[in-house]
From Swiss-Prot:
NCBIfam families xref list: MenG_MenH_UbiE, PRK00216.1-1, PRK00216.1-5
UniProt cross-references to HAMAP family, sorted A to Z: MenG_UbiE_methyltr
SUPFAM superfamilies on file: S-adenosyl-L-methionine-dependent methyltransferases
UniProt record, GO biological process: aerobic respiration; menaquinone biosynthetic process; methylation
Residues where S-adenosyl-L-methionine binds: T79, D100, D128, A129
Basic and acidic residues biased stretches: 1-12
Descriptive protein name: Ubiquinone/menaquinone biosynthesis C-methyltransferase UbiE
Family the UniProt entry places it in: Belongs to the class I-like SAM-binding methyltransferase superfamily. MenG/UbiE family.
Uppermost EC category: transferase
Its biological purpose: Methyltransferase required for the conversion of demethylmenaquinol (DMKH2) to menaquinol (MKH2) and the conversion of 2-polyprenyl-6-methoxy-1,4-benzoquinol (DDMQH2) to 2-polyprenyl-3-methyl-6-methoxy-1,4-benzoquinol (DMQH2).
Species this protein is from: Pseudomonas putida
Keywords tagged on the record: Menaquinone biosynthesis, Methyltransferase, S-adenosyl-L-methionine, Transferase, Ubiquinone biosynthesis
This protein's encoding gene: ubiE
Pathway: Quinol/quinone metabolism; menaquinone biosynthesis; menaquinol from 1,4-dihydroxy-2-naphthoate: step 2/2; Cofactor biosynthesis; ubiquinone biosynthesis
Catalytic activity line of the entry: a 2-demethylmenaquinol + S-adenosyl-L-methionine = a menaquinol + S-adenosyl-L-homocysteine + H(+); a 2-methoxy-6-(all-trans-polyprenyl)benzene-1,4-diol + S-adenosyl-L-methionine = a 5-methoxy-2-methyl-3-(all-trans-polyprenyl)benzene-1,4-diol + S-adenosyl-L-homocysteine + H(+)
Length: 256
């Protein structure tokens, strides 16, 4: 975040992709992006990742340790990929809360899971990750997949996730990160800034949202920085696993 001020009463700014915008405007701009892409979000995930997002999410679920009877919160749950799998794991004695700040994404997720008949133990909640509307010490596991980079105050969101976890509960953060290989990094940059906006234009008639996606990935904290943020928030035993040469990383932390 850029806290420089143009005057004594100027609003702090933050990044929206590569742009500096007033903090109060970022959530609105992010909402516009996801209202635009919600209907074809799943298709674009498959196109842009070559289906790899399914493997990344599967590994995240394996790391979560979720079992029957658990209570799970999936933040920025969108179209419900993780929630559907957690629903089967926790069974009829457990509960999954699919939370998303974006009404369009939440509607797509709700409709999709209801159509698949897997929403019996899933609750759908419109919620801000920075101000989660849940009791303290409530969940066995909290996940956020490809959502943290869109949050204005990431530190506040991580503290909010810690608060709602039970002692011993796990936080899993699956997010785009920094490639560990220089050659891969160069190829990924070319892919991100050429192919992603083009695919967005062809499939959703919206290149700008996918340009924002590419830029937001570059502005997100790298693996070690995010690990330090989780430790600072109060998590123990924070580790991360790189996937696809660090293009994606999953961080895990335990609430003391």
């Amino acid at each position: 975040m850029n806290d420089q001020r143009k005057g004594d009463h100027a609003e702090p700014t933050t990044h929206f992709g590569y742009q500096d915008v007033p903090e109060s405007q970022k959530a609105k701009k992010v909402a516009e992006v996801f209202h635009s892409v919600a209907a074809k979000y799943d298709l674009m995930n498959d196109v842009l990742s070559g289906g790899m997002h399914r493997l990344w999410k599967r590994f995240t679920i394996e790391l979560s340790g979720v079992r029957a009877g658990n209570r799970v919160l999936d933040i920025a749950g969108g179209t419900g990929d993780l929630a559907a799998k957690f629903s089967r794991l926790v069974g009829p004695t457990g509960q999954v809360v699919l939370a998303d700040i974006n009404e369009s994404m939440l509607k797509v997720g709700r409709d999709r899971l209801l159509d698949r008949g897997v929403a019996g133990n899933i609750e759908f909640v419109q919620a801000d990750a920075e101000k989660l509307p849940f009791p303290d010490n409530h969940f066995d596991c909290v996940t956020i997949a490809f959502g943290l980079r869109n949050v204005t105050h990431k530190d506040e969101a991580i503290r909010s996730m810690l608060r709602v976890l039970k002692p011993g509960g796990r936080l899993l953060v699956l997010e785009f990160s920094k490639p560990t290989n220089k050659l891969m990094s160069k190829a990924y940059d070319a892919y991100s800034f050429a192919f992603m906006p083009l695919a967005g234009k062809l499939i959703t008639n919206d290149s700008e949202s996918y340009r924002y996606l590419a830029e937001s990935i570059r502005m997100h904290p790298d693996q070690e920085t995010l690990k330090a943020m989780m430790v600072e928030a109060g998590f123990d035993r924070v580790t991360y696993h790189n996937m696809t040469s660090g293009i994606v990383a999953v961080h895990r932390g335990i609430k003391p």
